[in-house]
Amino acid sequence: NGKFPKIGNIDESSGSSGPPTNWIRSLKEEDLLFKAAKFEFFYTYNADKKNYVVLSGWSSGPWATGVKFCEILEHYTLVKNTTADIENIIRSLKNLGKDKDYLIAGYPPFLKNLFDSKGINWKEYKIDVLTGGESTSVEWKKYIRKSLGNKNAKVISSYGASDIDIGIGFETPFTEFIRELAYKNSKLNYELFKTGENP
């Protein structure tokens, strides 16, 4: 109706394809996002069986991801907004201890730089990963798991954008299974995705 809601939030696009755009949502619209994020968190990470501490390595600002991610997950677990600060994340892990289950979130290039850091022995911590913002390959996920010293670490991609909101889609164990199969079988990959590249 052209009117701003009295309560809600305003996200801003990155401006990568032109001037940044403001996206205005009411609290009612945000409620759907909270429900989707809760499902994603508990379904993909079995969060009801773990004592997660989430370290948010997303960039913070007017964009849809950083601050909003923390606002959502603090309803379901303990969250610290470290932003994309490698030293802060390493310091936080050392301060909070090795007995916790950690979920570290961030963009793929940042996460690779983080886990390449020699400032901590990653293998001594129980870490799962949430990423998004750009695509990742099967090889990238293998590299991250190897860096963590845990071939069973969950490394999940979540999908969204400023205009449609964050976390509207996400990988599951089943979609990862299909992707792995296609990665190993080029014929199957083409039959499923009509391309020679693994998605």
Where are these regions (language model features)?
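Residue-level recognition of alpha-helix initiation/capping sites
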Residues: 4-5, 64, 135
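Nucleotide 5′-phosphate-binding alpha/beta core
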Residues: 1-52
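Short, flexible, solvent-exposed loop/turn segments with mixed acidic/basic and small polar residues
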Residues: 45-46, 71, 120
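AMP-binding/adenylate-forming
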Residues: 26-40, 52-112
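Active-site glycine/GP-rich loop and adjacent strand/helix microenvironment
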Residues: 76-199
